[in-house]
Regions:
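Sec-exported extracytoplasmic/periplasmic mature domains
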Residues: 6, 15, 24, 28-35, ...
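Structural recognition of the beta-strand scaffold that forms the well-ordered cores
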Residues: 1-5, 9, 38-43, 77-80, ...
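Charged helix-capping and loop-helix junction motifs
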Residues: 16-26, 56-63
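Short, flexible active-site loop motifs that bind/organize anionic cofactors or intermediates
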Residues: 9, 29, 99
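Oxyanion-hole/transition-state-stabilizing segment in secreted/luminal serine hydrolases
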Residues: 1-20, 44-50
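Glycine/proline-rich loop-helix segments at beta-alpha junctions forming the active-site rim
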Residues: 31, 40, 56-57
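Catalytic His-Asp segment of secreted/periplasmic serine-dependent ester chemistry enzymes
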Residues: 45-129
Length: 129
């Protein structure tokens, strides 16, 4: 299961602790009936200044919280895509990767696919074209 999430929660005022707790609860629910299920948490992506202006620091802190959570939780992997969308932590996203300043466009999704593929298909010769 891949989670690509977090930005709407930040926009609605949830704290990083609340957000991580919500995802922990979802994971625990699934693991109760399927303990071998694997999870990937994709980092919360940055936005352009058009969306959630001033929230870049919160996005960075949420990603650190997700990473810590994944490091201590069995069968959960944190994958960084933030770096591909942003020059450095705390700055706004490259606008050419987002359709509206918030959601990835085709080029942005291709970038995500390239980043996720090794985690989803580690034993194959699958190539993205």
């Amino acid at each position: 299961i891949v989670f690509i999430c977090g930005i709407n929660d930040i926009g609605h005022g949830y704290t990083k602790e609340e957000i991580v707790q919500n995802y922990a609860a979802m994971i625990e629910t699934v693991q109760a009936s399927n303990p071998d299920c694997q999870f990937v948490i994709l980092s919360t992506l940055p936005t352009t200044s058009a969306f959630y202006s001033g929230q870049q620091g919160k996005i960075t802190l949420l990603n650190l919280a997700f990473k810590r959570f994944a490091n201590k939780t069995p069968n959960v992997t944190f994958v960084d895509a933030y770096s591909a969308f942003c020059p450095k932590a705390g700055e706004y996203a490259y606008p050419e990767l987002l359709s509206d300043g918030l959601h990835p466009n085709a080029e942005g999704y291709a970038e995500i696919a390239e980043i996720l593929t090794p985690y989803l298909l580690p034993e194959t010769d699958f190539a993205i074209e």
